[in-house]
Amino acid sequence: MLTTGSIGAGIVITEGVTATVQHAETPSVVIRHRAVDGTTSTISRASPPLTSIMEQLGVTASIITECHLPIGAGFGLSAAALLASATALNRLFTLGLTPWDIARHSHEIEVEHRTGLGDVAAAQGGGRVIRHGPGIDARIERIFDLPESLFSVSFGPIHTPTVLGSPSQMEKVTSAFPSASPCDARDFFTKSKQFAEKSGLITDSVKKVFQICEKENVPAGMTMLGDGVFAYGKKAHEVLSPFGKVYEFSVSSTGPGIVKDNL
């Protein structure tokens, strides 16, 4: 599966997933969401991909993941959770895995569970990313040309496995792929919007936001795969705010790492 996956462009963002792992007699997973006021809520007590990463690494642990962004809304949180958990498990059990090993295991599991095709490859590092081939070993450009904040609104999830498992939908996605890589940041947003429209993935809610963003000259694209919009620049927050809760983040400078080590 190392050469299986998608090609394309995206942005690795600072808002990701934090994974806390501990030794345990039986494997367990808890998925939590942290609200703006600091309160946490449990979204799920099961995650087949995270259970699979423990099985693949040959370890038994409890994993608690936490994020601020909405799950299943196109922010790449499935890939982030896998990379974060694998990185933490590697440290806890002294597995001696390299960053490439961690990315390989995470990518294989994401493809197997159809939670994504290229997010792990992108999130190995930071930046505005252009993936020129499928898999984690393909050539990846990492460009740091978006110094200001990014903002996003989300109207709900799009079930990624359903889209990836639909031959007809994937045929539309393939035919909508741009003929050339974006030449700069502005072109990235233009191609992102065009791809959403031509692929048939765009929703009515996203169309409405796009119309306002275009009117206000705010660069914007659709979160993939999710019913939402991300936008860039000083006016972006103001333009998005009438449509719901606005999330703010920046372009990440790095990939996964250890935040706190209690060993």
Give the location of each predicted region.
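ATP-binding N-lobe of GHMP and related small-molecule kinases
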Residues: 1-71, 241, 250-263
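Short beta-strand scaffold segments in enzyme catalytic cores
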Residues: 11, 17-22, 119-123, 128-130, ...
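Short, hydrophobic/aliphatic alpha-helical segments
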Residues: 58-69, 104-111, 205-216
